[in-house]
């Protein structure tokens, strides 16, 4: 029995960052992509050797944007409000011709998130949430987030997260 795979992987990304002169506003836009092509041969076992050849292609790309506003003081201490959106798509095609098997799958995930993090040298408190819509799931998924941080000294960080 013999096995062999040959891969061709290409990818890249771009990012743009903007910082306001007073650094209270930060904005970024990003995009990346990766393409994979794989030719494979997974030994025949008890089948015809020509049945064991296959090919896989996968194209994945994502794009998004994020905005951060830094408050000098929001309610009880300085904080950063972060909001953003993302979109991710994965297109997979996997063929094993001799086994009469093909996987043709396209996954789209759109996301939006919002969080606020209050912080100073000793304390940090973060609360936020994320909404994800996956094309293979009927409903929107909400993921809450909360974090409490205490730094009694410069070298000790205690965290409680949800």
Predicted features, each with a name:
Residues 1-162:
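Outer-membrane beta-barrel proteins, especially TonB-dependent receptors
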């Amino acid at each position: 029995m013999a096995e062999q795979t040959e891969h061709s992987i290409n990818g890249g990304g771009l990012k743009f960052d903007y910082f306001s002169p007073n650094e209270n506003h930060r904005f970024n836009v990003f995009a990346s992509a990766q393409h994979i092509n794989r030719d494979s041969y997974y030994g025949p076992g008890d089948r015809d050797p020509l049945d064991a050849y296959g090919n896989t292609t996968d194209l994945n790309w994502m794009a998004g944007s994020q905005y951060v506003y830094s408050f000098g003081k929001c309610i009880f201490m300085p904080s950063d409000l972060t909001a953003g959106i993302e979109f991710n798509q994965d297109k997979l095609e996997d063929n094993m011709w001799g086994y009469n098997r093909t996987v043709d799958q396209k996954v789209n995930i759109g996301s939006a998130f919002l969080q606020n993090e209050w912080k100073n040298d000793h304390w940090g408190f973060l609360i936020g949430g994320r909404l994800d819509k996956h094309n293979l799931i009927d409903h929107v998924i909400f993921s809450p987030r909360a974090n409490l941080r205490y730094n009694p000294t410069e070298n000790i960080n205690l965290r409680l997260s949800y």
